[in-house]
A protein has these predicted regions:
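Conserved glycine-rich cofactor-binding loop
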Residues: 10-11
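The beta1-alpha1 cofactor-binding region of Rossmann-like NAD(H)/NADP(H)-dependent oxidoreductases
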Residues: 51-63, 91
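Substrate-binding pocket helix/loop in short-chain dehydrogenase/reductase
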Residues: 84-86, 93-95
Length: 236
């Protein structure tokens, strides 16, 4: 059976992907920091193996991965610091965002890649963002991490393509997750939900479809965005 290891699996897209892959027959290891959330996830899908771990803790990750053969790695863990002008950001918030969103994904990938390359198979996915491909105010460091993830995924793909290991970047925009709930004020949330939003399950279904493709089909990146409201005249 195919084994998938997913970080940031306690909420949002990560949780949806864990459930969807479990339903599709994968052995799923769901990693996250909240033991309570992991317990809830396992109660909903008893076949999922919960892994309580901080993705920035190298020794803990090495211990967790020591006895697991991973076919699919989904680097989904991420945070968004408080919205605001870069000049006003706290240094601690900058450090934490870089560590969780970028360094942890690179570290985990480095720990898993050797076994995939040795087997000449595997699939690594990264949760990117539209913010990594377009400029938005008040999220400079978050955008930098997502742009870096995009670049890393592309370069990693070039490194690994001769070995048959595939790499896919997930570019999602305006997804209804707790992350957005946490950072937006009431007015911003109202504006966001007045238009259509992508659901975590939508992203999860795409991931299952991409992973089901034959070895000769390589989805290097997929974008999933909401359809925008249409005016009575038919223009967007």
């Amino acid at each position: 059976m195919t084994t998938a290891f997913i970080t940031g699996a306690t909420s949002g897209m990560g949780r949806a992907m864990a459930i969807a892959l479990s339903d599709a027959g994968y052995d799923v290891y769901a990693a996250g920091r909240s033991q309570a959330a992991l317990k809830d996830l396992q109660a909903e899908r008893p076949g999922i193996v919960p892994i309580a771990v901080d993705v920035t803790d190298r020794e803990a990750l090495e211990a967790v991965l020591a006895d697991i053969t991973i076919d699919v790695l989904i680097n989904n863990a991420g945070i968004m610091p408080p919205l605001g002008n870069f000049a006003d950001m706290k240094i601690a918030d900058i450090d934490t965002t870089l560590e969780v969103n970028l360094s942890a994904a690179i570290l985990l990938t480095r720990l898993v890649v050797p076994q995939m390359r040795e087997r000449q198979s595997g699939h690594i996915l990264f949760t990117g963002s539209v913010a990594g491909h377009a400029a938005f105010s008040n999220i400079a460091v978050y955008a930098a991490t997502k742009a870096a993830i995009s670049g890393f995924a592309a370069a990693l793909r070039a490194d690994l393509s001769p070995s048959g290991v595939r790499v896919t970047e997930i570019v999602a925009g305006r997804v209804e997750t707790q992350l957005y709930q946490d950072i937006l004020d009431a007015k911003a949330r109202a504006a966001m939900y007045a238009s259509k939003v992508v659901q975590p399950d939508d992203v999860a279904r795409m991931v299952v479809a991409v992973l089901a493709l034959p070895a000769w089909a390589d989805v290097t990146r997929f974008d999933i965005m909401p359809t925008w409201p249409t005016s009575p005249s038919g223009t967007k």
